[in-house]
Amino acid sequence: MALMDFFKKKASGSVAKDRLKLVLVSDRAGCSPEIMEQIKNDIIAVISKYIVIDQEGLDIKITQTESEGNNGNVPALFANIPIKDLKHSK
């Protein structure tokens, strides 16, 4: 069944919600939605070499977090990537 889920299209509401999240995150981070999408795609490509991930549940954010020391807030990348299975080397 997992293979069939791969080909299933996302509902338009879900796609719109993901796009809105991307716009909000990119605005906070000071980079364009296109750059955020490229970062997300690159992370997916690299991680997918080693593990099977749930792309539907993937959540990548750039937020402001308090720096150690007195440097104020700095951008931080947070990624929540649900793992379906590990790929075994041959």
Curated annotation (Swiss-Prot):
Q: What's an example GO BP annotation here? A: regulation of division septum assembly
Which Pfam families does this chain map to? Answer: MinE
Disulphide bond pairs? none
Against InterPro entries, the record matches this protein to: MinE, MinE_sf
What are the alphabetically sorted keywords of the record? Cell cycle, Cell division
Family to which this protein belongs: Belongs to the MinE family.
The protein's role, per its UniProt record:
Prevents the cell division inhibition by proteins MinC and MinD at internal division sites while permitting inhibition at polar sites. This ensures cell division at the proper site by restricting the formation of a division septum at the midpoint of the long axis of the cell.
Give the protein name, as stated in the record. Cell division topological specificity factor
Q: Which organism is it from?
A: Lachnoclostridium phytofermentans (strain ATCC 700394 / DSM 18823 / ISDg)
Which gene underlies this protein? minE
